[in-house]
Amino acid sequence: MSLEPGQLDEGAGPAVTPGAPARWEHVTRGSERWVRGRGRSLEAAFEQAAMALCALVEDPSAVAVREEVELECASPEPDRLLADWLRAVVHAMASRHLVFRCFAVRRDGTRLFGHAFGEPLDRERHPFARDVRGVSLVDTHVWRGADGLWTAECEVEL
């Protein structure tokens, strides 16, 4: 899928070029809102997709690392694995009232093991953070491009 000019939201991570670090971004297509992560590995793309999702709630740079949460999911299909991973992130945010700054992901076959790093939601420190009770993951896509970079994207409705 290619982007048309003006479709990237401001606040996206740094640009990705071969050899460059991973990035995340928000993409709009009409009324649809997508989160997208890119990286040199599938794991890096999943980390960045989770960053994009969390950035819809609070600016990750405003979040301190005070807690670590372990997350795990499994699926033989990368698209389904992405959806399950993002659901696990949202569940941790909603059930524990946390906001996250960063993620570390490791994959072993069909299983994904992740660590989310962040802090409890504090209205004084995070006055503009959105409350997350759930998310609808409408469509997910995972692929490796001709440039060798992995992309993981998902349409979201908070």
Give, region by region, the residue ranges found by the protein language model:
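N-terminal intrinsically disordered, cationic/polar leader segments
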Residues: 2-158
